[in-house]
Amino acid sequence: MIQPQTYLNVADNSGAKKPMCIRILKASNRKYANTGNVIVAVVKEAVPNMPLRKSEIVRAVVVRTCKELKRNNGMIIQFDDNAAVIINQEGNPRGTRVFGPVARESREFNFTKIVSLAPEVL
């Protein structure tokens, strides 16, 4: 579960290293974001000479959470870190590669481009 002020890892090569969640989108009063939800984040650390800079406001999709994810078939999935993929206003990833596994729930939220770039879908 991701809440405001949570630091995440970036799972793509967009240039950001550590974004911090400042808002969960598509919910008026939601406190937590799970896998597949869109958040608004601020870049706290960035790679030099890349398009994304420090203190830039971006949108991101949560692709991995440390909190257990229960599926309808009874399977429970848990990742080692909280990670997100930086997206643009249309929902397409800003990077060209995605690192690490991605939860299958991203496909259900119509982020098929992120799922196709991922090396492993759990």
Swiss-Prot record:
Its main location: plastid. It is found in: Plastid, Chloroplast. Pfam families: Ribosomal_L14. InterPro entries: Ribosomal_uL14, Ribosomal_uL14_bac-type, Ribosomal_uL14_CS, Ribosomal_uL14_sf. One of its GO terms (cellular component) is cytosolic large ribosomal subunit. GO terms for molecular function: large ribosomal subunit rRNA binding; structural constituent of ribosome. PROSITE patterns: RIBOSOMAL_L14 (PS00049). It comes from the Eukaryota. Binds to 23S rRNA. This is Large ribosomal subunit protein uL14c.
